[in-house]
Amino acid sequence: MSNVRSDKPFVLAGRTFQSRLLVGTGKYRDMEETRLATEASGAEIVTVAVRRTNLGQNAGEPNLLDVLSPEKYTILPNTAGCFDAVEAVRTCRLARELLDGYKSHENRTLVKLEVLADQKTLFPNVIETLKAAEVLVKDGFDVMVYTSDDPIIARQLAEAGCIAVMPLAGLIGTGLGICNPYNLQIILEESKVPVLVDAGVGTASDATIAMEMGCEAVLMNSAIAHAQQPVLMAEAMKHAILAGRMAYLAGRMPKKLYASASSPLEGLIK
């Protein structure tokens, strides 16, 4: 059947990953909880806010890389807290320097770009984001980019050379789930680069829906870290991602207005 979907590898910057769940490292009670939740999630890519997390730039302070080693995880530096292109570019360059000492870290140029518009909504400033993306791509970075759910902006970011677009499902930290599935569907249908949902996931069903729609992966932090039992939620998210991907590949049944009996009517006992 020509419409049967076959699975394909999840590839970023030339590297294949088994897990389609990416996790953040903020908002946990302590580094031990961060470690346990990350392990339970099965994630291979861990994103880190360079401006808020010590990756070695602050000597004498606890270093996250001592807990989540680049020998085990692909560290994805992000530019959280940046409000203009200049700040974001500077932060990415700092991250590259900090990770350069880890020779086993294969993707020192892989970054997650986010440039925020304001503190209240944490919406992306798409104008500054596009400016930063163009500079970073020219500078040799592999840019995964947090963006709005505007399909035109997503297209422009891909055309600028970003290797993945990451539209928000809902506002960062709200747990509202996928607020505009129609725009997300347009992005998925038109994008020539991987599409990952970023921000807004609140529980396992949100992650499953994103994967059922055809997203390559989902990135989350608050949904796990703010759960009553973060480690258990991390494991739930691992299974949610798998279930959603399998359902997408399987193809859901068509929706119908009227009932259709599961058993045939022919041959009924009279």
Curated annotation (Swiss-Prot):
Domain of life: Bacteria
Biological process per Gene Ontology, one example term: thiamine diphosphate biosynthetic process
Protein residues bound to 1-deoxy-D-xylulose 5-phosphate: 173, 199-200, 221-222
Quaternary structure annotation from Swiss-Prot or TrEMBL: Homotetramer. Forms heterodimers with either ThiH or ThiS.
Residue numbers annotated as active site: 112 (schiff-base intermediate with dxp)
Protein's recorded name: Thiazole synthase
Name of one Pfam family that matches: ThiG
Molecular function as annotated in GO: thiazole synthase activity
EC nos: 2.8.1.10
Sequence similarity: Belongs to the ThiG family.
Subcellular compartments: Cytoplasm
Predominant cellular place of this UniProt entry's protein: cytoplasm
